[in-house]
Every structure is written in structure tokens, then in C-alpha cells.
């Protein structure tokens, strides 16, 4: 079985990931669980051959030099895949994350009116956060797709690598891949401010300079979407502020309080009948939240989110209870993801 056949099989099974690891048979992750494919174990040379088969010369050199590399790969008629190739104790390994060829709409994903309001904002910072594999890219792709169908904007994305491919409809969309089209997130963001964008998507806000430039872009009249690997809205604020040195923290809190539109922290939960759905914690940049950010009272944010339901805010547990009430998720699976399991 060649790599294209393996990836086609993986996509047909509804897998989020295909795992290749020397010394073991191929495995897939379906609905959050890793399962073995009924194939013989692959040795190092077989795994390496499968990986090298889809790499270009630059990617092979990068892999051999750094012992790991990231890239994306298309299987026409099947899907697009985000690939991480690496080495492990038994030899070569790789993980192929499935990126659906069709961008799901906000309606299909069950994203409510509050998400449309975020997307319709003329300027500000929207952060979508969560652990790896929590559906952040899917959520952001739906929001970009909504803009593409309803606004006449210039949308600039900076990604590592490009995941969902957007065709320009009403919007002009330029997608830039780090290490292919630009040297780094920070370099691309610095240029972005001179490229007449209305909307900027930053695939990952992973360092001080990128975060600083994203805040500046939001402050200077752009709608900026970004991701972080934090697990709650409050932790997201802490993470951003903590990146900066002590003498800049007050300034950063002030910038955040002025520009923050929303923090959406999400996790994927198993659905009744198969598949997974995102549960969201939603914190909006209300005057109360802005004051808490400015005054460094992050601990009080949770109660502000709880009491802001009429505005569209919700804690993760409120989001999980809503999914249970709608019959989409069982109490048991909601309890596994809840911050306060006793509430279920």
C-alpha cells in the first residue's frame, strides 16, 4: 500500500490523523481514539520511503538537517494533509492531520450568532485557543469563509503550513506559508501592515514579537484572528502578558484591553452517534472584561463570563450543558471535558 492509498483509506474512515511509526503497523485516530490498521508493521526504510515519496528536495534536506519537519500535502479528490515528519527510537515516523477539502460553514459547525458578530467587527483581536487537535483551524476557516461570502475585504493569512485553502469569492484572499513564502510569522506580520489588509489571520502567536505585532495590527484598525494553545480564556490573557518583560506588562494589558474582541477556548467532545463537536468557552471584550484586563484581575474573569450569558458569553461547562440539552453529547462525555465534573 503506497502513501496515497493509506491517506485515502484514512480519510474514508473519518480519521483525524494517520500515524506512521517504524516498528509498528500504521494507525489512525478516529473520534479521538487511536486504532491499528490491519497491516504488517513497517520498518524504518519503509516509513522513510513513504515520507520521502511526498517530500520535495527542500523538505528532505530540512528533515535530514533538523530530524523533523512540517509541510502540507494534497491528495486530489481525497483531502489535504498537514504533515509532521520526525525521528523516534525505532526509526522514522510521521503524523498526517486530515484537513477537509471543503471548508465547513459556521452553521454546519453549530457556531451561533455570537461568532457572526465577532466576524462582522471592523477591527480588533479574536483569539481561538485550545490544545492541539481541538479544531481551532476548522473554527477559524469557517469564520474566514463567512467573510469571503459576505464582505469585500482583503484577507491575509500567515500559516505554518497552510491548512484550509480558500478561493477568493467576494474577498481577495492571500495565503502565505512560513518557510515557503516568508521567513517567519513576525516577518510576514511586519510586511502585512504595508499590504493593505482588512483582516489578518496569524496561524500561531508563538513568540513575543509576533504577539506584539498582532496587537499593533488590531490596534491600528485591522481585524486580527490568532491562535494559542491555552485551555481557557483567563489563561490566554495570562499567557500573552507573561510573554513580555516586567516593564512592558502594564502597556500590554492596556493594548489588550483596547483591542480584544473575544477569546474562544474550545475542546472537541464525542457526539452521540459518532463524530465530534466543539464545545466553546466564549469571553467577549465587554467593558467589564476590559477593566479586569487593565487592572490585572484575571481571577475575576470566570464570574464575569458566567454572568454575561445574555451577551453571548459562556463558560466551557455552560457550553457543554447546552450540547447535552440539545441531545448532541452524552453527560458522560461532557463530564470528561468539564472544568467542574460534579455539575454533570
PLM feature spans:
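Short, flexible helix-loop junctions that flank or precede catalytic/ligand sites
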Residues: 1-344
Amino acid at each position: 500500500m503506497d502513501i496515497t492509498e493509506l491517506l485515502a483509506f484514512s480519510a474514508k474512515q473519518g480519521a483525524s490523523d494517520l500515524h506512521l511509526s517504524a516498528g509498528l503497523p500504521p494507525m489512525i485516530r478516529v473520534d479521538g481514539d487511536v486504532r491499528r490498521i490491519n497491516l504488517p508493521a513497517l520498518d524504518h526504510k519503509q516509513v522513510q520511503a513513504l515520507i520521502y515519496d511526498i517530500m520535495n528536495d527542500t523538505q528532505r534536506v530540512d528533515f535530514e538537517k533538523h530530524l523533523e519537519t512540517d509541510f502540507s500535502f494534497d491528495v486530489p479528490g481525497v483531502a489535504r494533509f498537514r504533515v509532521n515528519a520526525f525521528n523516534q527510537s525505532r526509526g522514522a515516523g510521521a503524523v498526517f492531520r486530515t484537513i477537509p477539502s471543503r471548508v465547513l460553514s459556521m452553521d454546519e459547525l453549530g457556531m451561533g450568532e455570537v461568532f457572526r458578530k465577532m466576524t462582522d467587527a471592523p477591527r480588533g483581536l479574536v483569539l481561538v485557543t485550545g490544545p492541539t487537535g481541538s479544531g481551532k483551524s476548522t473554527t477559524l476557516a469557517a469564520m474566514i469563509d463567512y467573510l469571503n461570502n459576505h464582505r469585500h475585504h482583503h484577507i491575509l493569512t500567515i500559516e505554518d503550513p497552510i491548512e484550509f485553502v480558500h478561493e477568493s469569492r467576494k474577498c481577495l484572499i492571500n495565503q502565505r506559508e512560513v518557510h515557503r513564502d516568508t521567513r517567519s510569522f513576525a516577518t510576514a506580520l511586519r510586511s502585512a501592515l504595508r499590504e493593505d489588509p482588512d483582516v489578518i489571520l496569524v496561524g500561531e502567536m508563538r513568540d513575543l514579537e509576533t504577539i506584539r505585532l498582532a496587537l499593533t495590527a488590531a490596534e491600528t484598525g485591522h481585524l486580527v484572528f490568532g491562535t494559542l494553545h491555552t485551555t481557557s480564556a483567563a489563561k490566554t490573557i495570562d499567557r500573552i502578558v507573561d510573554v513580555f518583560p516586567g516593564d512592558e506588562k502594564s502597556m500590554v494589558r492596556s493594548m489588550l484591553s483596547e483591542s480584544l474582541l473575544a477569546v474562544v477556548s474550545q475542546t472537541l467532545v464525542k457526539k452521540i452517534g459518532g463524530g465530534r463537536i466543539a464545545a466553546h468557552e466564549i469571553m467577549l471584550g465587554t467593558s467589564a472584561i476590559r477593566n479586569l484586563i487593565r487592572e490585572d484581575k484575571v481571577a475575576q474573569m470566570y464570574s464575569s463570563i458566567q454572568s454575561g450569558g445574555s451577551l453571548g458569553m459562556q463558560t466551557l461547562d455552560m457550553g457543554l450543558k447546552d450540547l447535552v440539552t440539545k441531545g448532541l453529547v452524552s453527560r458522560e462525555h461532557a463530564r470528561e471535558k468539564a472544568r467542574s465534573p460534579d455539575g454533570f
